[in-house]
Design a protein with these regions (language model features):
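Short, glycine-/aromatic-enriched active-site segment of Class I SAM-dependent methyltransferases
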Residues: 101-121
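Conserved Class I S-adenosyl-L-methionine
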Residues: 143-208
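A short acidic, Gly/Pro-enriched loop at the edge of an enzyme's catalytic core
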Residues: 59-67
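Short alpha-helix
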Residues: 123-138
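A short beta-strand submotif of the Rossmann-like class I SAM-dependent methyltransferase core
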Residues: 69-72
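A short glycine-rich, Lys/Arg-flanked "PGG" loop and its adjoining helix->strand segment in the class I
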Residues: 80-95
Length: 208
């Protein structure tokens, strides 16, 4: 189960590579349609189902061996609430996957936090404190995968290239001025703030 499944890449590739059966929920109709197309492209449309709907409060009729929410813990009102929500759709001894940012180093000011596109410093925890929060909820961390600065670079720079290509193809679009401004500012903002302060990880959890 993947709450906030986006364009479905994780479920589709897992179905292709590992033969899993899965369900994804996303509130974006565009992403849901892209996910369905991706499933067809990879030949796994019979193994994955993508539902256009609000994942807030979603509990599956059947239990899953893995329940995930990557980068969308607002669905449960935060990390703790999302873990509680996912647990309701999880088999005994199943694994919860939580994808969540954390501070690599604590921003020195609230403005620095906002430069990372956070609302405030309190939005995220330092990595040791995030791991401790799982412990407080009575979960063991059994695996984690963390982004490094190079993978952050690849992720962010791909957006810049996409914006540049879009501008070349749509110079007279109503949004062209806004996209041009974003493309001009984003590399500098990213280098000054997100790259230095913000980390990202996926954490595999099992209840005690």
């Amino acid at each position: 189960l993947d709450l906030g499944s986006g364009s479905g890449e994780m479920l589709c590739t897992w179905a292709r590579d590992y033969g899993i059966i899965g369900v994804g929920i996303d509130m974006s109709q565009l992403f849901t349609e892209r996910a369905k197309l991706r499933a067809e492209e990879l030949g796994v449309a019979d193994r994955v189902e993508f539902i256009h709907g609000d994942a807030v409060g979603y509990v599956a009729d059947e239990k899953f061996g893995v329940a995930a929410c990557l980068g969308a813990t607002w669905i449960g009102g935060g990390v703790a609430g999302t873990i509680d929500l996912l647990a309701k759709s999880l088999r005994t001894k199943g694994i919860i996957l939580i994808g969540e940012p954390y501070w690599r180093q604590l921003p020195t000011t609230e403005d620095a936090a906002k430069g990372c596109l956070a609302n405030s410093i309190s939005d995220f925890l330092m990595l040791p404190h995030l791991l401790a929060s799982f412990d407080d909820l009575d979960y063991d961390v059994v695996e984690m995968v963390l982004a490094d600065q190079d993978s952050w670079d690849r992720y962010e720079a791909a957006k810049w290239l996409t914006m540049r290509q879009w501008l070349e193809a749509n110079p007279d679009d109503d949004f062209a001025k806004e996209v041009r401004t974003t493309l001009t500012l984003e590399p500098k903002r990213y280098a000054a703030y997100t790259r230095e302060y913000l980390g990202w990880g996926v954490f595999a959890l099992m209840a005690r």
